[in-house]
Amino acid sequence: MGAALTILVDLIEGLAEVSTLTGLSAEAILSGEALAALDGEITALTLEGVMSSETALATMGISEEVYGFVSTVPVFVNRTAGAIWLMQTVQGASTISLGIQRYLHNEEVPTVNRNMALIPWRDPALLDIYFPGVNQFAHALNVVHDWGHGLLHSVGRYVWQMVVQETQHRLEGAVRELTVRQTHTFLDGLARLLENTRWVVSNAPQSAIDAINRGASSASSGYSSLSDYYRQLGLNPPQRRALFNRIEGSMGNGGPTPAAHIQDESGEVIKFYQAQVVSHQRVTPDWMLPLILGLYGDITPTWATVIEEDGPQKKKRRL
């Protein structure tokens, strides 16, 4: 080992001297680039036939000793590197063989891939010893990462279906309730309208005959209407005011009603009687009661009897 160190020190000193004399770098000398450059210049000078190799070296200012050192160092370095690599290989193989013989002599031969990278073994519970509960947390994370996405997708789809179904049911119920409420409101308004309407019992055929007679009489009196026209001409303003004053005075004093204010009734007006007690109850005559109850969806006792009589008769049980 000491001889190798001595050779290495001498090599370093020689490289420094040669580099100083020739101007070549130590890296170029070790790699062989300096030798290749010198050989190229010497070859160029000798091919011209002017001088020999020794004369060419002297011309470049390089002695034979320096040239020999430059040509020897790359070969020496390559051989030394190969020897060192071989020694390291042999030493490493010996160390591995010793380790195998010492520690794996009584162990079983592994059946795993022999080219697999070797890693140091660690106890799985080591992290749980240092950090209690970390293994459970890591397991939960792995579970969520593996099938958590599918679980969330399934739960989300189930929730969405429930929301859609519940919304549909609520909408159907709301529409149904709104329809029923509007129908009841309309029927109630119609019933109240019928209760508060002025009802008149009229004889339609007699009214038609009277209208025909009036039309015939008006046609026969076509010529007499001309005299009536002149007779019924409009009054001047003073006459009109005097006439209005007489009419208002007679109406205010309870006098007879002028003929212009008398309205011809087309039939007999039905009079409605209100409740005797002040309870704001609705009053309906008997002849209108089935119609009002029918609008509210109720069945009167009379109608119930008719339906029961006209409906299917139940068969009596035989004893």
Curated annotation (Swiss-Prot):
Q: Under the cellular component aspect of Gene Ontology, which terms does the record hold?
A: host cell; host cell endoplasmic reticulum membrane; host cell nucleus; membrane; viral capsid
From which domain of life does this come?
A: Viruses
* Transmembrane segments annotated in the record for this chain: 287-307
- Which is a GO BP term held by this UniProt record? viral penetration into host nucleus
Query: Which cysteine pairs make disulfide bonds?
Result: none
Annotated region described as DNA-binding, given as residue ranges: 306-319
Where does lipidation (N-myristoyl glycine) occur on this chain?
G2
Q: Which GO terms describe its molecular function?
A: DNA binding; structural molecule activity
Q: Does the keyword Transmembrane helix apply?
A: yes
**Where on this chain is Nuclear localization signal (motif)?**
311-319
| Keyword terms of this UniProt record | Capsid protein, DNA-binding, Host endoplasmic reticulum, Host membrane, Host nucleus, Late protein, Lipoprotein, Membrane, Myristate, Transmembrane, Transmembrane helix, Viral penetration into host nucleus, Virion, Virus entry into host cell
| Region entry D1, spans | 266-301
**Quaternary structure, from the entry:** Isoform VP2 forms homooligomers, and heterooligomers with VP3 in the endoplasmic reticulum membrane. Interacts (via D1 domain) with VP1.
Q: Which family does the record assign?
A: Belongs to the polyomaviruses capsid protein VP2 family.
The name this protein carries in UniProt is Minor capsid protein VP2
